[in-house]
């Protein structure tokens, strides 16, 4: 059974020593969703938001946050990221968020991909909260990761439907 790598022999937390690990190309993808009322979706679609375009600002926030993941997550290694892509797509009941992060490093970029989607979701919420404080940030999860000793991971199916149809608010 795998063990938690952030615990030392005496149970103290520690940053994992990756100095002996191979430098390989690592990739990770994450998804998330901000559920909102139809009137908020309509406002975003028409770009009628007092703070500007939330989708573009969310993309930039996600990219900036991914680069600072080691400051968000105390035991993460600062990594030389070579590519970050964050997309924000408006759909009928909210905003779908996707991130892809790539690095050539000694440890993976899963946390960077998750932080990118999380920051993007929080930014959408911040920019639209004047219209609806009841928005929900849901379904943030790792979709896939490649590279490294633990091998590849591909999520078989989402744990929940991110954008359920017909839900009344």
Protein language model features and the residues they cover:
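C-terminal binding/interaction regions
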Residues: 1-55, 60-77, 81-169
């Amino acid at each position: 059974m795998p063990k938690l790598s952030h615990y030392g022999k005496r149970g103290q937390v520690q940053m994992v020593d990756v100095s002996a690990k191979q430098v390989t190309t690592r990739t990770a993808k994450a998804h998330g969703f901000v559920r909102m009322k139809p009137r908020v979706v309509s406002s975003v679609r028409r770009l009628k938001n007092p703070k500007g375009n939330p989708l573009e600002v969310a993309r930039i926030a996600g990219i900036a946050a991914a680069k600072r993941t080691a400051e968000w997550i105390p035991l993460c290694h600062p990594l030389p990221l070579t590519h970050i892509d964050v997309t924000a797509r408006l759909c009928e009941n909210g905003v779908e968020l996707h991130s892809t992060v790539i690095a050539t490093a000694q440890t993976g970029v899963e946390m960077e991909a998750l932080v990118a989607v999380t920051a993007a979701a929080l930014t959408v919420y911040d920019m639209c909260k004047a219209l609806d404080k009841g928005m929900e940030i849901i379904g943030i999860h790792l979709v896939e990761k490649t590279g490294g000793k633990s091998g590849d991971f591909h999520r078989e199916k989402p744990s929940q439907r991110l954008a359920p149809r017909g839900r009344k608010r």
